Amino acid sequence: MELYLYNTLTRRKEKFEPLNPPYVGMYTCGPTVYNYAHIGNLRTYIFEDILKRVLLYNGYIVKHVMNITDVGHLTSDADEGEDKIEREAKKERRTAWEIAEFYTEAFKRDIKKLNILEPDIWCKATDHIKDFIDLILILEKKGYTYKTSDGIYFDTSKVPDYGKLAGQDLENLLPGARVEYNPEKKNPTDFALWKFSPKDVKRQMEWDSPWGIGFPGWHIECSAMSTKYLGQPFDIHCGGIDHIPIHHTNEIAQSEAAYDKPMAKYWLHGEFLVMGEKRMGKSEGNFITLSDLEEKGYHPLSYRYFCLTAHYRSPLRFTWTALESAQRALFRLYENMKRYPQENASYDKKYEEEFHKAINDDLDMPKALAITWELVKDDQVPPEVKRATLLQFDKVLGLSLNNPPEIKIEIPEEIWKLVEERELARKNKDWEKADKIREEIRNKGYIIEDTPQGPRVKKATPLTK
């Protein structure tokens, strides 16, 4: 079955034809490890995981590379400001190396909780300084660089189609809102390949180079590491839509200038997670982490399910109500799976074909989820066949349907004492006291349900409080 993907570079949905079938080289921009990933970041990684799973589902052999930006990402997202990791190190009174290691491991824990398949290759920027210098030397030899007082810059005026990814030409490209003005630049869009360490300042992360002591620019990192592990051109480059106007535009410019060939054949970008009227982001001060969701009683896979309810190229509005609905739907799926007999059976070919068509149509996960529920509700399909078909779907959905997680929530001792006190009041038919205790339990963040088997306590969500 043919697979179609929307290519940002050509602005159209295209039939996927890898450069060297059945092998696929895929590079995804990883985290800048100065803080916890927020759930907006994680939406992008879930989209990329779905893409990878769809490729595998279609029989491709995927080599997936993801970088870890542990140096060089400045607060402006381009060439000015403080290194985000060094800034955080000062704030937390730890070394930059400790900060990077701590948040790298936190990120890996998050993606494991979300059932995101790990890349085949993790590549840390600090392990590839020589590769960055070698690429800058190639660009220097070909006449694409110039020196300023604070670093070595790439001259974007020498690239006729600079800005093609964003659909703008050089004259119409203004420096992005998060790019600070540098009067020494030849063009506002020029970007740093190598930044010099400030005079009389000893940075924690700095290296010697042919141009002086300093550190790499953010954009050169992805160009050098993707080429090292995947060659050039490679098949697929992914990221968030915020990467299009600056980061990915600059990657293309320097990579294609260096090697005189396209960087990647297909460029895919995930839309923002929106909260209120703004996109979720650390710079906006409105971000939520996966741990925040867990503390409120949501399972990480409920967030994964929530992300599947919208197409990756559509903004997704985050609300607690929507997340609560996603969790309920996921738990219903788990309950159905537990009821189905674990017998050997073949999957339903009609439903599998519909599901396959949906995922191969530019990763149409909302439609794939709708087909999933049609199957669950179809009384004509035997339960053991439903189970086999859902397990087939889960190769892409990634919801752990074969092994539904046990939802365990620790209830504090003080809550259990209140439950016992309430049970005693109910036994004595002191309904007023029982109601007051129920309200007290609710105010402490838990709700109590009376069942024939006795009281059941669970953590309240923002919806049930």
UniProtKB/Swiss-Prot annotation:
It is found in: Cytoplasm. It holds the Pfam family CysS_C. It catalyses: tRNA(Cys) + L-cysteine + ATP = L-cysteinyl-tRNA(Cys) + AMP + diphosphate. A motif ('HIGH' region) lies at residues 31-41. Its cofactor is Zn(2+). It comes from the Bacteria. Keywords: Aminoacyl-tRNA synthetase, ATP-binding, Cytoplasm, Ligase, Metal-binding, Nucleotide-binding, Protein biosynthesis, Zinc. ATP binds at K282. InterPro entries: Cys-tRNA-ligase, Cys-tRNA/MSH_ligase, CysS_C, Rossmann-like_a/b/a_fold, tRNA-synt_1_cat_dom, tRNAsynth_Ia_anticodon-bd. It is an enzyme of class 6 (ligase). A motif ('KMSKS' region) lies at residues 279-283. GO terms for molecular function: ATP binding; cysteine-tRNA ligase activity; zinc ion binding. Belongs to the class-I aminoacyl-tRNA synthetase family. This is Cysteine--tRNA ligase. It comes from Dictyoglomus turgidum (strain DSM 6724 / Z-1310). The gene is cysS.
